[in-house]
Design a protein with these regions (language model features):
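Mid-chain, well-packed structural core segment of small domains
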Residues: 51-72
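Short amphipathic alpha-helices within nucleic acid-binding modules
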Residues: 38-44
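N-terminal first-folded block
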Residues: 2-34
Length: 96
């Protein structure tokens, strides 16, 4: 998969197939809300394992019952690449 940054048009096209995800700065982000902290923690753990398998690691933020997943490609100059859209799709499949 390419480390080249995506264009704005490519990002918007990818987001049309990624409900709930947003392009924020140079990242893709989505936040999930759970019943409680333990459910958010379990979801974060699952995303962590998925990220490790793909060797593309998302930033995870837990705020009690909310999990925010944020991804960018460091080797693409901290820009959004196909690695990010692919990871976003996989995370959505995992958590929804």
């Amino acid at each position: 998969m390419s480390d080249q940054p995506l264009t704005e048009a490519e990002i918007e096209l990818a987001l049309s197939d990624l409900p709930g995800w947003s392009h924020v700065g140079d990242r893709l982000e989505q936040t999930w809300t759970y019943k409680g902290h333990l459910q958010a923690l379990a979801a974060a753990s699952a995303v962590g394992f998925l990220s490790e398998q793909r060797d593309h690691h998302a930033d995870l933020t837990i705020n009690y019952n909310k999990l925010r997943v944020s991804t960018t490609t460091h080797s693409a100059g901290n820009k959004v690449s196909a690695k990010d859209t692919d990871l976003a799709r996989a995370v959505s499949d995992l958590l929804e």
